[in-house]
């Protein structure tokens, strides 16, 4: 029988040399390397029986002879091997192998790690057992194949390197590791094409040894293995000579220095180009951001383009007059106002008024947005305020417009978590009315959150004039609609009807409505915008986009028809209700149907009767569902109606003094314990009971109207199912026909 087993332990090799293997004989044993402890083991194979000696040769290199003997004997006892002759023979053979391995005395745990030009490789053992099948092997041949003789390794390493026993790192191993897992610095160096590094070690000594080898090769012939060594030596010396050249080293050094300087200059130039303005000041753009001066010649907006806010426009016209003729007022001892604060809901034209001031005043105009003063860096907001006012003072008389001023002028805080949060507003307060006066600089501020502003900012001397820019009334809406209609092609438009139907619309809403109407007309292929397009656009702004078709579920459509019909019936037969405009069961936005109203005239105050009528109309939808389909079939479609009705009832009780039980008082919402204004339990109970009573009474009134006009309600619902949308004239005709 014959078997061969190959095992390996770490060893070193240089280049691609090889040599003839050593042969050792071990009777009845098999020797191989292992990462575990040394041991002798028995094989239980039926075809042959053998005793295996498993040794960690890396461990053996660091052990003494006595220690090796003890380790082998202990392994034999643990495995039941009592043949002393066998143990001694194994120990002798192992001991005879160690000197050749101790010549190097370098053991590493990780293969393929480079040390200079030396790379780890496996030390091969091939063990061949001899003997008959079924009997104890008569002997074994151990073939040890080192990849290079220790004699050639020794000159290439210093004594300190050869004496290392455990795993270690050198410049070469670190370089190899960096090649496998390059860092950001390594990648940058490779991108910049750094010059090659010199090899570590004693180069003159290595070169001398290799020169001797070459000289010897000229006198004697060598086999292929020796020829490979000589070829390696020639290449190594050629590389060493080129690296040792002083001229080459200096050239590479100069090139590397020049390369570094060029890279630094390029990066510095790119960095400075981002933060240098046309006048040469560095970091100016960081400090001022978008706080730029606006050229009045580029602004084509005047007060003629501002409609629907005559009171605010008149206040700003006076400011413009101050700027145009300051001596007219200074002769009488008057002073220019320090600031004008524009307050109002979003979309009412505050920014448009500021643009009109810039276009009319013909003085330098600076614009900044409040959020631009907020920065991550501490102190940047205050610095931007200083820079803005410094630039404005140099161009006085001028106007500074700060949009969304509540971002920078919010109430100061005492929070220890934000100790620097007040720096920006403090700087703004100082610039507007501090120790140094800003003659000729007027500040325009715009906000829709006046209550959030610091009180010190609102006092006279900072914002002397406060202008309320509210939503336009009926006349204002007509003016705005007339202005925007001149910019499109349109048919005959009923401005009065359109203005009444857009109650509560801001100037921005009206502009958007007319733009939507123009888009719809273009999509329909019409040459001009008609009243129908404008009404469709208004419904889209109010209720959302219309869906293509009604719901495929007929039961849902029937419930929606009776629900919307309930709103219409209650509104039609309630005296103080708004007049009906349109009823539809076409889904729009989140709602499945909608009932629209148009007030007869502008309301500047609301009476209690009108509020109760509005609540009755809102309750009409849920009341219709209950009366027609039963209490088990009421739906969630009344959620919006109930929310609005609850809001009205709550305001009537808590804010408007319209409850006899609660009395003539206002009751603010409780802010919680510890705030000093917590409501008592009796008050809370009385308020809740009164709100519930008002809602219940409204619901009963709505049901009473629907019970009285059941026939009209049914006819209106059937018409909605047939025609989907009905206007005021259609509704009136259906109800009158049902009564006859």
Swiss-Prot record:
Pfam families: AAA, AAA_lid_3, Peptidase_M41. Residues 1-256 are mitochondrial matrix. CDD domains: RecA-like_FtsH. One of its GO terms (molecular function) is ATP hydrolysis activity. Its EC number is 3.4.24.-. The active site is at 564. HAMAP family: FtsH. ATP-dependent metalloprotease that catalyzes the degradation of folded and unfolded proteins with a suitable degron sequence in the mitochondrial intermembrane region. Plays an important role in regulating mitochondrial morphology and function by cleaving Opa1, giving rise to a form of Opa1 that promotes maintenance of normal mitochondrial structure and mitochondrial protein metabolism. This is ATP-dependent zinc metalloprotease YME1L. The lineage of its organism: Eukaryota, Metazoa, Ecdysozoa, Arthropoda, Hexapoda. The gene is YME1L.
